[in-house]
């Protein structure tokens, strides 16, 4: 398949707006379309709803992806290239305790006003100080934000921070300073004004969130004119809605439904790499996990590859460490413990548990896909 000529392809919208899913299903109305053609209006049945139009009053990965089409960051993480790419900033420099961002010229907000460095400084200070903001912590170490000219932003930090782009730039969206000063912060009445390829048309709490194409977008014009984001919490209801034509796209497909939907003649399933990680926390403060040998035995006793193959039908992959390849800090040289129950028993015996031991396994049933089945396998 070829990529759309528009600035944001349909696949990229799905990737950003439905992060961490096991898969996506596209309805009959979209399945036969090429990348050069699409519907004017696309309905997304999503497991997560938009409960507020406050752009900083959330910390959800999927909502970050949705908002990015209305209000944009200085830079974003391109997971295909595994590197940061400029969006509102065309370049930047790291100078110890100073970060200098050079804004892209000619960028306008959806109301026609130009983007300047003052909008960037205002938005970041708003994230840092607004009482409803859930994005304050990334700016705790920011000392000052300077705007020497309309297209330059200088951010001073207490100490050098190599993770600054990850924590304080990625997913930190820029709003219009003038619009906030004019309309106030009742975003339910006056939605945020951004520079993105779409603008907010309407919103219902935990209902429909409608965004429409910004015809004056500074970048390449996307081909889809309007997206309707509808919350459908139940997995089965999303699948039924897709097959009934009530939606064009669904996310978080139940694992057991993937093979059936893949065989469906009028549905296309797209699998995208997710960031959801299944792990078991072994607290080394409490017994028996304070013993390194017991922790090692636990790692040797779980056949992770079998879990992916038999429970998730191959829809996943086994990690060698605590983070995946798309996360800062990933070490490709780290190797996981192999499945070796004999080794696990030997380690337990050395730790003083020759006959094994009983431990409690806590989890929240239904919170993650197939979580009960995974825990049953681990417990056995």
Predicted segments, located by residue:
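Append "and occasionally in soluble cytosolic enzymes with long acidic Gly/Pro-rich linkers
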Residues: 213, 290-380
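Surface-exposed binding/hinge segments that line
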Residues: 93, 98, 137-179
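A structural "hinge/loop" feature
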Residues: 48-64, 87-88, 113, 135, ...
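N-terminal secretory signal peptides
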Residues: 1-12, 35
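Ligand-site clamp/hinge motif
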Residues: 100, 214-260, 379
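N-terminal lobe/hinge region of extracytoplasmic solute-binding protein
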Residues: 45-96, 125, 193-195
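Gly/Pro-rich hinge or "lid" segments in bacterial periplasmic/extracellular proteins
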Residues: 78-83, 169-222, 226, 236, ...
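Aromatic- and charge-enriched surface segment that lines or borders ligand/interaction sites
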Residues: 90-133, 148, 154, 238-241, ...
């Amino acid at each position: 398949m070829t990529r759309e000529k528009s600035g944001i392809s349909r696949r990229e919208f799905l990737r950003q707006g439905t992060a961490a899913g096991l898969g996506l299903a596209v309805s009959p109305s979209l399945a036969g379309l090429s990348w050069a053609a699409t519907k004017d209006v696309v309905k997304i049945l999503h497991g997560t709803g938009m409960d507020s139009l406050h752009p900083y009053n959330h910390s959800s990965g999927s909502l970050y992806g949705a908002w990015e089409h209305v209000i944009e960051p200085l830079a974003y993480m391109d997971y295909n290239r595994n590197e940061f790419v400029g969006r509102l900033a065309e370049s930047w420099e790291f100078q110890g305790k100073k970060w200098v961002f050079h804004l892209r010229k000619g960028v306008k907000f959806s109301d026609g006003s130009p983007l300047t460095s003052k909008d960037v400084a205002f938005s970041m200070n708003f994230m840092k100080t607004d009482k409803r903001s859930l994005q304050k912590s990334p700016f705790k170490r920011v000392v000052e934000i300077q705007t020497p000219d309309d297209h330059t932003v200088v951010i001073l930090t207490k100490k050098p921070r190599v993770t600054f782009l990850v924590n304080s730039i990625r997913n930190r969206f820029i709003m219009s300073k003038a619009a906030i000063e004019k309309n106030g912060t009742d975003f339910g009445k006056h939605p945020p004004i951004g520079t993105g390829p779409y603008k907010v048309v309407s919103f219902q709490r935990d209902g429909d969130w409608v965004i429409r194409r910004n015809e004056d977008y500074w970048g390449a014009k996307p081909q889809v004119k309007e997206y309707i984001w509808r919350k459908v919490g139940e997995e089965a209801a999303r699948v039924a809605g897709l097959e009934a034509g009530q939606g064009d796209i669904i996310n978080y497909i139940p694992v057991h439904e993937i093979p059936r939907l893949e065989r469906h003649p009028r549905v296309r399933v797209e699998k995208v790499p997710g960031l959801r990680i299944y792990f078991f926390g072994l607290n080394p403060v409490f017994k028996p996990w304070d013993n390194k040998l017991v922790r090692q035995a636990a790692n040797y006793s779980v056949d992770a590859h079998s879990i992916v193959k038999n429970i998730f039908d191959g829809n996943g992959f086994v990690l060698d460490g605590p983070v995946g390849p798309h996360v800062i800090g990933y070490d490709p040289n780290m190797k996981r413990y192999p499945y070796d129950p004999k080794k696990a028993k030997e380690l337990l015996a050395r730790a003083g548990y020759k006959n094994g031991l009983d431990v409690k396994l806590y989890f929240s049933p239904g919170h993650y896909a197939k979580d009960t089945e995974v825990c049953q396998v681990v417990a056995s």
